[in-house]
Amino acid sequence: MRIAVTRERGVGERRVAISPEAAKVLVAAGHDVVVESGAGSAAGMDDADYGSAGATIAPDRAATIGSEGLVVSVQGPTDSDALAGFTEDHVVVGLLDPVWNPEAATSVAATGATSYSLDLVPRSTRAQSMDVLSSTATVAGTQAVLTAAYRLPKLMPLMITAAGTIPPARLVVLGAGVAGLQAIATARRLGAVVEGFDIREEALEQIRSVGAKS
């Protein structure tokens, strides 16, 4: 199978759909992996890394997607330039977000291409190997707290000094999904007093399990 890896064009998007390590596995399995030049640069993976893995480096997007095959990306195509070249012989896989951004999925469908949105894969043991959303949410939950700690005008942990005691910061995390639970765990490790809130009754025990009040 021909597998195309396109460069992400979203503002601030630094991810790439397939790493050189994954490309090497796919090539070894007999697939033809084509990577758009610069696709992994923002993630610290250059064209030489992909070339060493056996992938072909294409100079632009048109040459990358070709006339048929599987096209993988993190975010789905969002404009006419990104949609150009898709045909009924293409299969698009990525985080297309059809619930909140139905126009993107509709635009892909209008080209005749088949699309699969990985953000709709259920969180189940059977589908765990395809659950890219949970890994992304884990990173987001961690980074959210680190950013908050940087911007917070006080220290996170309790500090007892000769000059006095500094009470710990108090954080409230709304939502106890993957990102929320990771945010709670990160804040607890930084020494904050954390409370979690979720409308789901079953989430209360999960909130307590990572050390927060519910």
Each PLM stretch: what is its role?
Residues 44-46, 69, 126-128, 206-207:
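Short Asp/Glu-rich motifs
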Residues 50-54, 132-136, 211-214:
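Short, hinge-like loop/turn segments at secondary-structure boundaries
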Residues 5-107, 111:
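An N-terminal-biased, well-structured beta-alpha scaffold segment characteristic
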Residues 6-42, 154-214:
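Glycine-rich phosphate/diphosphate-binding loop of Rossmann-like nucleotide-binding domains
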Residues 66, 139-142, 146, 181, ...:
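A broad detector of short, well-ordered amphipathic alpha-helices
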Residues 7-10, 46-49, 65-71, 122, ...:
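Short linear motifs at secondary-structure transitions and domain/linker junctions
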Residues 2, 8, 81-170:
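Glycine/serine-rich phosphate-binding loop and adjoining beta1-alpha1 elements at the start
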Residues 69, 119, 198:
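Acidic active-site catalytic centers that drive phospho-/nucleotidyl reactions
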